[in-house]
Every structure is written in structure tokens, then in C-alpha cells.
Amino acid sequence: MVVKVGINGFGRIGRIVFRNAIEHNDVEIVAVNDPFIEPHYAAYMLKYDSQHGQFKGDIKVEGNDLTINGKTIRFYTEKDPANIPWSETGAYYVVESTGVFTTTDKAKAHLKGGAKKVVISAPSADAPMFVMGVNNETYTKDIEVLSNASCTTNCLAPLAKVIHDKFTIIEGLMTTVHSYTATQKVVDGPSAKDWRGGRTAAQNIIPSSTGAAKAVGKVIPDLNGKLTGMSMRVPTSNVSVVDLTVRLEKGATYDEIKEAVKAAADGPLNGILGYTEDEIVSTDLNGDTRSSIFDAKAGISLNKNFVKLVSWYDNEWGYSRRVLDLLVYIAKVDGNA
């Protein structure tokens, strides 16, 4: 059974989720809502993408709706989520990708329009967070609003799970070397809460905060309080990389660590965790659907108990694919797929 989904917010992640859904046989996008974009402009932004190229399909505007590959997608422009008539299209699930309605109470407004469940495509202060391959099996039917966590948490958590399950992480620090995003500036501009964040994105390496490492403690409770991290925003447009430095309880050679990651990537975490010994750089992974691609040749160990691990991720495409995978997973648990 195909899962019918609505998208609220047709920005960066909303559009990339839509593009991924075209490739995902188990998901059908039936409606989109964005109060700041009219349908013709939405069609234009969906068709042309500076990072991922031109949309491979047919896009038309008919009345106020989009027609994608012959299928009608209802297009709404409601500012209040409570006023979006999701029930008109049978959208049982909603992807909340505005970046605005990220708490349980705010996201629950979608239920008034007929949606039954909401997946927030961002970290949430109070909604339960799920990372595919890590803690998705803890989802229960009674949960109405949930979060897919962040792109960085989706990269870090599968790797941390493998290492912790096999060797036990005592403590660790993470740095994500992260491509710039839409919240940053093209030229220097005001940013009262984050002075460095107001500097030109394309010219600077900008230290920044991230809650991604601490969030791992929410999806892997055994690591709660054992990981923290920071971000370096760099002048690349997409694809980021996690640098995880951990102290291990059970000593292991770097080769043993590689073997453990490869076994997980080829086995239970296939499609989520990747493994490569190729001499790759960031652009090689543009459009990669996996959450985390372990770079076997980039890591180093000081000794058997202290190691630095490196794992790549397409912070747009891979994350958006996991949003859909999470939707399909919860639909199966709910009995709707």
C-alpha cells in the first residue's frame, strides 16, 4: 500500500523530499502547502536546482495545482497549519519542513486538517526523535508527532551505534565540517544571536554550535551525556562530513573497527550506513541516499582505545530520503502500508 503524504513548507528540504519521493515506490506526495510561494514559482523551483540538477520528469501547473508526471498535486497557501485541508487529498501523514512548527503543540495543528501523523524534518525540543537504523523500532502507534532529528545526527548515530555496540564508547567529541545552508549570509550581514554566523558563507570557515552529538543521547540512551560536538561551516554548497573522536572501553585496532563498520554497512544497516576505501572528496557523494558513508582511509587511531573516525553525508539528499523511509516505517507499524 502506498503511503499518501503532504508536505508543509516547500523550501530546501521540502523540495528535496518531494524529489526523493518520485524515486520512492512506497510514497505518494498528494499535497503541498507553502504560503509564500505561488504554484508557478513552486514548479520552477522544483524543476531547476543548482545543486541537484534539473528535475527528471514532467511538471505542469493546472489552475492552482501542480501536475507531476501526470498526477495532480494539490497546492495550498495557508499560513496556519490548522487550516490546511489535508483530508481532501487523503494525506494521512505530513512532513513538516517549514522549520517553524518544530514543537509537538505547533505541529499538532496539522491534525485539525485531517492529517493523522506529523514528521518534523528538523530536531525538536519535545517531540520524540527517531533515526532510521538506530531507534526507529521504539516507535509506537500512539505517537502523533515525531522528529527525524537532524542530518548530522542521522550521520553520526548509525556510526556511533556500531562502535558502541562492538567496543563501548566511554566518551567522545564530534566536529561536523558542514556545507553552508540557507540561514547563512551571501555577504556580511546582521546576525545578533550569532555574530560569526553573519559573515559571508562563501569566503569563510565559520565555527558554529550544533546539538547533533548531544541528540545522539536521545536516540541511543546509553550514550546520553557521553558525546558533544561543534560545527565548522565551510564554503561548499552541499555534502558534509563528521569527524568523531572517541575513547573506547574495549581496545581495538583500526582494522578491527573498519571490519565492524563494513559488516554493519553490508548487513543490518545496508542503505543507511555506507563504507568506502576509495579516495573520495565531498562532491563524489552529492546525491547519495545513505545517511552516513564511513571513510575507511580518512580515520586514524592513536592507540587501541583512542580513535578518530570520519563519515560523509549528503546533508540534503540523504537526510530527505530518511524522512521518507521513516514515514514508510511508521505507516507499516500503524497498519497503513
Curated annotation (Swiss-Prot):
Stored PROSITE patterns: GAPDH
SUPFAM superfamilies associated with the record: Glyceraldehyde-3-phosphate dehydrogenase-like, C-terminal domain, NAD(P)-binding Rossmann-fold domains
Q: Which reaction does it catalyse?
A: D-glyceraldehyde 3-phosphate + phosphate + NAD(+) = (2R)-3-phospho-glyceroyl phosphate + NADH + H(+)
Q: Which residues does the annotation list for site: Activates thiol group during catalysis?
A: 178
As recorded in UniProt, its EC number(s) are 1.2.1.12
Recall the GO molecular function terms of this protein's record: glyceraldehyde-3-phosphate dehydrogenase (NAD+) (phosphorylating) activity; NAD binding; NADP binding
Catalytic residues in the record = 151 (nucleophile)
Q: Where in the cell is it found?
A: Cytoplasm
Pathway assigned in UniProt: Carbohydrate degradation; glycolysis; pyruvate from D-glyceraldehyde 3-phosphate: step 1/5
- GO CC, alphabetical: cytosol
Report residues binding D-glyceraldehyde 3-phosphate: 150-152, 181, 210-211, 233
For this UniProt record, the keywords arranged alphabetically read as follows: Cytoplasm, Glycolysis, NAD, Oxidoreductase
Residues annotated as binding NAD(+): 12-13, 34, 79, 315
Assembly information from the UniProt record: Homotetramer.
Q: Which family does it belong to?
A: Belongs to the glyceraldehyde-3-phosphate dehydrogenase family.
User: Can you say what this protein is called?
Assistant: Glyceraldehyde-3-phosphate dehydrogenase
Q: Which organism is it from?
A: Phaeosphaeria nodorum (strain SN15 / ATCC MYA-4574 / FGSC 10173)
| Classification lineage | Eukaryota, Fungi, Dikarya, Ascomycota, Pezizomycotina
